[in-house]
């Protein structure tokens, strides 16, 4: 999975897909009451990126629904995953539940269309800190109360704050979640980052019987050398400001017979087992 990073303006969606991304990450900005208002990162953001691009959240969902609905004139078959970078750290953790209700409701109304020809892409809920776990509970509660639990099959969870992996597992256990999980490891492209925690996540992923990390991605990679380093370690995904650079690296002899781009037929919640 090549995840285009910080794809917050509507016009950027096709731009990043044209560069080779098959997944997009966008920031969800909330007001003080936990209402999702905009796809907006705010300042500061990654080096070399414009931090001010944004869209109204519901309008953005309307657009990516069209891009991921077969038969729609805007349909792009390559876009198979949306990663929602939920900016919950900007609001009180007491509002995390309200935020979960709001995001689930807006996805039902503007993306899934409550079953009426909605978008087909998978949804990854990127939560910054384990203290905001009530967002997940609220999201699932809302799907159940609205009679649309079928969409749980399309939804995954990812804690992105580089917290202790065992602490993350404990929170997932508390929530009763042991599937549809990704584990991210990374830092803004402005700073270097070692591989110690990334290696630990991959080790857990590859431990037989361990259910809490079936997929791992590294972020935000901009240098080809760091992309190669992550691929050699065996990550499932790379988040980058430059999807075209990831595509070039994947075409190199070292990687071309080991990796391919994920398609809609690939389940993003299953641990990959080489044939």
Swiss-Prot record:
Active site as annotated: 5, 41
Domain of life: Eukaryota
Cystine crosslinks: 45-51, 47-190
GO MF entries: lyase activity; metal ion binding; phosphoric diester hydrolase activity; toxin activity
Binding locations of Mg(2+): 25, 27, 85
Gene Ontology cellular component annotations, sorted alphabetically: extracellular region
Major subcellular site: secreted
InterPro entries: PLC-like_Pdiesterase_TIM-brl (IPR017946)
Tissue expr: Expressed by the venom gland.
Name of the top EC class for this enzyme: lyase
Job description of the protein: Dermonecrotic toxins cleave the phosphodiester linkage between the phosphate and headgroup of certain phospholipids (sphingolipid and lysolipid substrates), forming an alcohol (often choline) and a cyclic phosphate. This toxin acts on sphingomyelin (SM). It may also act on ceramide phosphoethanolamine (CPE), lysophosphatidylcholine (LPC) and lysophosphatidylethanolamine (LPE), but not on lysophosphatidylserine (LPS), and lysophosphatidylglycerol (LPG). It acts by transphosphatidylation, releasing exclusively cyclic phosphate products as second products.
Protein name, per record: Dermonecrotic toxin SpeSicTox-betaIIA3ii
């Amino acid at each position: 999975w090549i995840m285009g990073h910080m794809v917050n303006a509507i016009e950027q969606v096709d731009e990043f897909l044209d560069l080779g991304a098959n997944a997009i990450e966008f920031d969800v900005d909330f007001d003080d009451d936990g209402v999702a208002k905009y796809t907006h990162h705010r300042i500061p953001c990654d080096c070399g990126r414009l931090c001010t691009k944004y869209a109204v959240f519901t309008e953005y969902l309307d657009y990516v629904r069209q891009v991921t609905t077969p038969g729609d004139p805007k349909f792009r078959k390559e876009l198979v995953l949306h990663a929602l970078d939920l900016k919950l750290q900007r609001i009180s953790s007491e509002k995390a539940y309200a935020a979960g209700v709001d995001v689930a409701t807006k996805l039902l109304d503007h993306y899934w269309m409550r079953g009426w020809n909605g978008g087909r892409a998978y949804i990854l809920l990127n939560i910054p800190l384990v203290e905001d776990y009530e967002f997940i509970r609220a999201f699932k509660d809302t799907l159940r109360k609205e009679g649309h639990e079928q969409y749980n099959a399309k939804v995954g969870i990812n804690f992105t704050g580089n917290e202790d992996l065992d602490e993350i597992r404990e929170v997932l256990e508390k929530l009763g979640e042991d599937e549809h999980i990704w584990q991210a490891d990374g830092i803004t492209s402005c700073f270097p980052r070692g591989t110690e925690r990334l290696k630990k996540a991959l080790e857990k992923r590859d431990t037989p019987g361990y259910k809490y990390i079936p997929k791992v991605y590294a972020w935000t990679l901009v240098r080809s050398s760091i992309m190669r380093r992550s691929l050699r370690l065996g990550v499932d995904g790379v988040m980058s400001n430059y999807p075209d650079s990831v595509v070039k690296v994947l075409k190199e002899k070292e990687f071309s017979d080991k990796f391919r781009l994920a398609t809609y037929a690939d389940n993003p919640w299953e641990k990959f087992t080489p044939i």
